[in-house]
A protein has these predicted regions:
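Conserved histidines in hydrophobic membrane contexts and catalytic metal-binding motifs
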Residues: 1-335
Length: 335
């Protein structure tokens, strides 16, 4: 249910908080460094970790502070003015997103959800075995029919059986891709093993001997990244340690992932390019793994698959309800 509620998160937040999410288009954009300086001045006790670049001329900057789910600050891309801020957990859709991704309890919640997704796959498998007609494939068509004129108990049974078989395929995809997001390193290794693909290169580090020099502005990093690849920049990950690199994330035209999976790593002190990861040229294992997130969110097929994702996300509640009614009826009969 929570997953269905955040499929259209961006659209919902733009409707609820229009003053934070969109601005009128006017002139040239202000330098990104201007926005960063304004944020650091306004929030001196907080740590800026990443910047979401505007995807449309109207969209604002989103600056994440302290961690991925901490303080969200929004800025006008044309004036550099800060428009407002909130903690993700203090907004309804943000709270639902945290419930969906970590049960509101952090890393432990993620692991619980990952195991639950594995159990859902097992339930789908056992459900398929129970759905399979006892007389074999000759009577398989009965498993796809609902007898609407039947007594209500048989109607509930048919709704559970037919709804389950139609939802099963999509639920397995959602569950498996959910597992890949929680246990990403394990699933990535498995994908690489199955496809005989090499692993992604290790994250490069900055040379700390450059500390103390005049650090290039963020706009210089972005201009250099654009010279390397003209694809749109989606996120900038700022270094959180003296050794960390500054990462510019880009989305290639052929990518399904909404944020892209192409990365350019820079030395944070010198702007030297340390590594370029082009999603279009990645090994097959990495390319397959990169489809799991857009499959999980339904974005891979545009609006139709996003709507389908909402419907499929509601199906476990329907199956649980009909299954509970069937269990209760059997219990009454056995008394």
């Amino acid at each position: 249910m929570s997953g269905s509620m955040i499929v259209f998160r961006d659209e919902i937040e733009a409707f609820i908080y229009p003053e934070l999410m969109e601005v009128a288009v006017r002139g040239e954009r202000a330098p990104v460094q201007t926005v960063l300086d304004a944020v650091k001045q306004a929030y001196p006790q907080d740590r800026l970790i990443s910047v979401r670049m505007p995807r449309t001329p109207q969209q604002t900057y989103l600056l994440k502070m302290n961690d991925d789910h901490g303080l969200f600050v929004y800025a006008d891309p044309y004036s550099g003015e800060l428009l407002g801020a909130h903690y993700q957990e203090n907004t309804l859709i943000g709270w639902i997103a945290l419930l969906h991704t970590e049960l509101l309890i952090g890393e432990g919640g993620k692991n619980i959800l990952g195991v639950s997704a594995l159990l859902l796959i097992c339930m789908c498998a056992t459900g398929f075995v129970m759905w399979w007609p006892p007389n074999g494939i000759k009577n398989i068509s009965r498993g796809f029919k609902i007898r609407w004129a039947a007594p209500w108990k048989k109607l509930i049974f048919d709704m559970h059986r037919v709804g389950g078989i139609y939802a099963m395929f999509f639920l397995v995809i959602i569950a498996f891709t959910g597992v890949s997001l929680v246990f990403n390193k394990t699933v990535a290794r498995l994908t690489n093993f199955v496809t005989a693909s090499p692993s992604r290169p290790a994250t490069p580090l900055s040379d700390t001997s450059g500390a103390g020099r005049a650090i290039p502005s963020l706009d210089e990093f972005l201009n250099q990244a654009d010279r390397i690849s003209p694809a749109p920049t989606t996120w900038i990950n700022l270094p959180q340690s003296p050794q960390a690199s500054l990462v510019v994330r880009k989305k290639m035209p052929e990518e399904f992932h909404p944020n892209g999976r192409s990365f350019i790593y820079f030395d944070q002190y010198t702007s030297e390019v340390l590594l370029i990861e082009n999603a279009s040229e990645a090994p097959s294992g990495t390319r397959i793994f990169n489809t799991f997130y857009p499959l999980h969110t339904g974005i891979i097929g545009g609006l139709p698959t996003r709507i389908l994702q909402v419907v499929v996300g509601i199906s476990p509640l329907v199956l649980f309800t009909t299954g509970f009614i069937m269990w209760r009826n059997r219990r009454k009969v056995n008394r």
